[in-house]
Amino acid sequence: MKSDNPNVRGIKHMAFAVRDAEKALGAYARFLHVPAETEINVYPKSKNRVALFYLGGIEYQLCESMELDGRFAKWIDERGAEGLHHICYEVDDIDAALAHAQAEGANLRICQACELYGSHPHPEGWVAFLDDEAGGIEIEFMQVYTPEQLKEYEDFKGI
């Protein structure tokens, strides 16, 4: 059955919490032919290392905390295993997506990288997180910037 939500365009990315991004990337390289030379980006502001690649048209992020009490390390410790941390849904209108979710009882979660609630600028677009997990998976909405907006929000790179 297909969703009738006209605001959701599709999956922007899926983020996996891993203990070791390099090791996890090695498994994806062996089993799914993801290029082994995929770069692992370091994000000093949020203190994460992230291997980013595309598979089947979907962006995958293998996210490793650089500190023991970091966002992804805590998530792994709470659950006792690595796994799918969140799915980011690309939306046409983030305010409409949030209004719909909140009308259905959803609460907003603080963005752990920015310490902000609700819609706010991020490197690729406006984002917001729901506090309510769906089957143990966090939900993120992103309204991707237009090319003009991308230049305007260049300062948010590296979060």
List PLM regions with ranges.
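N-terminal beta-strand motif that seeds the catalytic metal site of vicinal oxygen chelate
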Residues: 1-25, 84-91, 147, 152-159
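Vicinal oxygen chelate
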Residues: 2-5, 18-26, 30-36, 52-53, 61, 79-159
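Short, structured motif recognition centered on aromatic/hydrophobic residues
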Residues: 11, 15, 28, 53, ...
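An N-terminus-focused feature that recognizes amino-terminal "leader" regions
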Residues: 27-31, 38-47, 67, 143
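N-terminal strand-loop-strand beta-hairpin
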Residues: 34-55, 59, 131
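Helix-adjacent hinge/juxtasegments
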Residues: 62-90
